[in-house]
Each structure stands twice: as C-alpha cells, then as structure tokens.
Curated annotation (Swiss-Prot):
ATP 2 binds at residues 352-359. InterPro entries: AAA+_ATPase, ABC_tran_Xtn, ABC_transporter-like_ATP-bd, ABCF_EF3_subfamily, P-loop_NTPase. CDD domains: ABCF_EF-3 (cd03221). ATP 1 binds at residues 34-41. Keywords: ATP-binding, Nucleotide-binding, Repeat. Residues 2-252, 320-526 form the ABC transporter domain. SMART domains: AAA (SM00382). This is Probable ATP-binding protein YbiT. Coiled coil: none annotated. Belongs to the ABC transporter superfamily. ABCF family. YbiT subfamily. Disruption phenotype: No visible growth or ribosome-associated phenotype. The gene is ybiT. GO terms for molecular function: ATP binding; ATP hydrolysis activity.
Length: 530
C-alpha cells in the first residue's frame, strides 16, 4: 500500500495542493485526474519519490516494490533495447549484472563460485531465465520490431523510445505502478493492447491520462485533484463524472435551502427584535441563524473553453476527390494509388500505426507535400482550415496573443470580435498581452482553435488535435466537432474522440488502405474485434 500523509506542495505564496492524505492499494487502478496545472504530475513525482513535498510524507509498505513510467527517454542510449526493458526490475537487473560479471572473470575463485551459486538461486526465483523472452514480448506489444531488440537505444527514434520505457515499466510488474500519460505516442491499436495488459495485472496502479475511453476501460477508481484537494471516487471515469456532478449539485442545493432558511429567520428577527412581546422569539431565531453553517463551495480549477466552428459558405455534393494518389519517401511508398470520394458533411477518421503515413496523407491533401503521382481535387468553393500536429512554426514570431489572433480577422471583424474569441478560449486580459510563443502546448492548441473559429472554414483537417489538451478542452472540442456542419478529416489516437465523431474510417496499413463507410465501433466489429 502507498500512503500519502498530509502532503502539501507549495510553489511561491500559494499552495498547489495541501493536506492530501490518501491510501492507494488493494490492487485498485486509480485514474489521477484534474485540470492542467492542478498538480497531477507533481503529486505523481512525490508519490514516486522523485520530488520532496513542502509538508507531509509518503510511505510504502516495506515488502512492496514500486515501479514507474520514466519520461527521460534519452537516459539509456548506451544500453540495448532489451536490457533497458529488463532494467525496469531493479533487483533482477542487479543480480543479472553481478552474475554476468563473475562469469566474465578469467578465473573464478571459490568465493566467487559460492556467490554465483546464490545469485543463480535468486535469479531463478525472480524468473530471470525467462526475462529476455518476457521483455521481448512486451516490446512487440508496444510496436518495437524484433530486429531492434538487441540494438542500442540510441538507434531508436524519439517517441518510440518512450514505448520502450513503457515496456520497462510493465516489465517491472511491481506492487505499485505509477503511469504518467502512458498512452502518449501510442496509436489506437497499441492503446487497446495496453488496456488488456493492465487489466490482467494485480498491481495497484495510479494513472494519469486524458484518454477518456482508456480511463473507462482500465480504472476501478478515480482520484480527482481539484480545489487543491484530492477526492477518491469508486468507478471509472464516466461513473466519476456522474457521482461528482451529483455531489456538487447536492452541496449547492443544501446551501440554497440553508440560505432560504437564514433569510426567513433573519426576516423574523428584523421585524420583531424591537417588539417586547416577541423579543424572546427573535433572540431564539437569531441563535438558530448562528447555528446554520453553509458548506464551503470552493472554486474549481476546471474550466471549459467555448469552442464552435461555423462555415462561412456551405458546400454541396462532393467535398474532395482523390485519384491514384501515391506518396512515399526513401523507404518506398506509404500509400499507393489511393482513390477517395468524400461527400460534404462526412467525418473521416484516418487511422493506422505510428509512422504508417497518416500525417503525410493530410499534408499531401492540404498541399504541404507534393504527391509522387495522382491528383487531389477539392470542391471549387472549398475553404480549408488545417490544424497541424507539429504547429510550433505558427508561433515563431514575436506577436502577443492578441496580435496573433488578430491576424485571422475576417471581413467585418473588429477588435472586440478577437477579444470575444480569446475570452471564450479562457485567455484573460493579462494573458492576451503575453508573447504567443511562450504559451503552453495546450494554450497553443486553443489558439489554433480560435484561428479556425475566425476563419469559418467549410472543411476542417485536424492532425491529433487533442494532444496537450486537458480533459475539459478535449470534451469542448469533441462537442464542437459533433455540432460542426462542414466536412471533417482528422487523425486521432483518442478512442472516445474517434468513436463519437467518425462516420467513415480510412485505415492506412503497410499493405493497403482500407476505406470503411460507418463508425469506428462498426469498423472494429467488421474486423472481429469487440
């Protein structure tokens, strides 16, 4: 069991959170949730021993092991991929290292012989003889091919290194497992594999994720970090949302009743306190008022941006016609002879494993990349709004937030229209004076949504738009795209996002491109996957 006792973390004058006392155990899987900036990752670092709290402490049962998903993807460059995974089990790795050292000696002393015999017993008890096989299986699960297993980590591409570190955390199979954003950099199929692996484990887990479907599939409890406090609810994310909403509504309703009661008593006191015959009753009611205590309703750190995408000019019939489209690089074509006819109003989800060509397809459709062959023909009146996955180039100038958004004013827009958009997207009057380039990833994402709101395109193309967003922004974006009347083409690894939006699926595989008319759940059923 992992226990936090009166944990407080303070940066500057205001505490990030305070007096958190909670027990994590029993093989439960806790989803640690809260708005960006509420302190989730900070609290996770404190639980893992990587950060000292301002006050309080964290204790782990002495016979239990703790494991965690590391974020330092360049820390193992000189090790093989397989060894990096095995290093997740610290005790096993240390025994293996000492055992290998003794066997590598030119001559083994009698003392070395006794020592290595003891090490062999420990190695066997920790299933060391199957370590490479188990590590290899996990690497295949996260998408690392066999030919890379014995190579150095330095040859694994950034992003994919994080997959190796996920395999490392899973290999540890500890009593307590801490996972901070384990689905980052994973495609939708690998996330489904991870859900199955975690559900088969007996470890107590604490998981930070913005993937609602993942939290629903894996978590048995939700730990909500809000109001500077931590509250634990039984159930998955959807069940938590219902329970938390009902609890807050009950609190507000109880306070409303108490306020009405106070007002009624106060009215009596005001009318009759000077009346000699009723002064005792007035005094009694005044005492009743003193006894009524309103529950404190703290301001939530959660805020939902207001996102709505409108069309300036509607299209009719076909939005896009693609014929014989082929695009590749030095290693050959990513997709070949792709034909696609997209009708107005369709919402097309482009799926596939990482590196298969999803972003390349979108870049080719918008003209950022030229096809090797084939044609891309948009409707004559198409007005395209594009959200690129890598959009840092849009923020390289020195414009303030207000100046940056003002670039996208349309005919008839004034300064107030820009301020209105920024306000809906949760940027304060102080925020809009900041340089846009210093904004966080989530804030830059909201800025790009504002750009698209001002442009009023009739076709939206979005490449991983939920990256860096908090849960509230994801849900607001999800609703905005559900209400959008135009045509949508998007890439996402968020299962809930894809399931709720897609009316058509385009899956790119190394062998072919699959075009399926229907939603994602229907597509999975067509493949025999539930």
């Amino acid at each position: 069991m992992l226990v936090s006792s009166n944990v407080t973390m303070q940066f500057g004058s205001k505490p990030l959170f305070e007096n958190i006392s909670v027990k994590f155990g029993g093989g439960n899987r806790y989803g640690l949730i809260g708005a960006n900036g509420s302190g989730k990752s900070t609290f996770m670092k404190i639980l893992g021993g990587d950060l000292e709290p301002t006050l309080g402490n964290v204790s782990l049962d002495p016979n239990e092991r703790i494991g965690k998903l590391r974020q330092d993807q360049f820390a193992f460059e000189e090790f093989t991929v397989l060894d990096t995974v095995i290093m997740g089990h610290k005790e096993l790795w240390e025994v293996k290292q000492e055992r290998d050292r003794i066997y590598a000696l030119p001559e083994m002393s009698e003392e070395d012989g006794y020592k290595v015999a003891d090490l062999e017993v420990k190695y066997g008890e920790m299933d060391g003889y199957s370590a490479e096989a188990r590590a290899g299986e996990l690497l295949l699960g996260v998408g690392i091919p066999v030919e890379q297993h014995y190579g150095p980590m330095s040859e694994v591409a950034p992003g994919w290194k994080l997959r190796v570190l996920l395999a490392q955390a899973l290999f540890a199979d500890p009593d307590i497992l801490l996972l901070d954003e384990p689905t980052n950099n994973l495609d939708i199929d690998t996330i489904r594999w991870l859900e199955q692996v975690l559900n088969e484990r007996d470890s107590t887990m604490i998981i930070i994720s913005h993937d609602r479907h993942f939290l629903n599939m894996v978590c048995t409890h939700m730990a909500d970090l809000d109001y500077g406090e931590l509250r634990v609810y039984p159930g998955n994310y959807d069940e938590y949302m219902t329970a938390a909403t009902q609890a807050r509504e009950r609190l507000l309703a109880d306070n409303a009743k108490k306020k009405a009661q106070i007002a009624e008593l106060q009215s009596f006191v005001s009318r009759f306190s000077a009346n000699a015959s009723k002064s005792r009753q007035a005094t009694s009611r005044a005492r009743q008022i003193d006894k009524i205590k309103l529950e404190e309703v703290k301001a939530s750190s959660r805020q939902n941006p207001f996102i709505r995408f409108e069309q300036d000019k509607k299209l009719f019939r076909n939005a896009l016609e693609v014929e014989g489209l082929t695009k590749g690089f030095d290693n050959g074509p990513l997709f070949k002879n792709l034909n696609l006819l997209l009708e107005v109003g369709e919402k097309l989800a482009v799926l596939g494993t990482n590196g298969v060509g999803k972003s390349t397809l979108l870049k080719t459709l918008v003209g950022d990349l030229q096809p090797d062959s084939g044609t891309v023909k948009w409707s004559e009146n198409a007005r395209i709004g594009y959200y690129a996955q890598d959009h840092e180039y849009e923020f390289e100038n020195d414009l303030t937030v207000f100046e940056w958004m003002s670039q996208w004013k349309q005919e008839g827009d004034d300064e107030q229209a820009v301020r209105s958009i920024l306000g809906r997207l949760l940027f304060s009057q102080d925020d809009i004076k900041k340089p846009a380039k210093v904004l966080s990833g989530g804030e830059k994402g909201r800025m790009l949504f504002g750009k698209l709101m001002m442009q009023k395109p009739n076709i939206l193309i979005m490449d991983e738009p939920t990256n860096h967003l908090d849960m509230e922004s994801i849900e607001s974006l999800n609703m905005a795209l559900e209400l959008y009347q135009g045509t949508l083409i998007f890439v996402s690894h968020d299962r809930e996002f894809v399931s709720s939006l897609a009316t058509r699926i385009l899956e790119i595989t190394p062998e072919r491109v699959i075009d399926f008319s229907g939603n994602y759940e229907d597509y999975l059923r067509s493949k025999g996957i539930e």
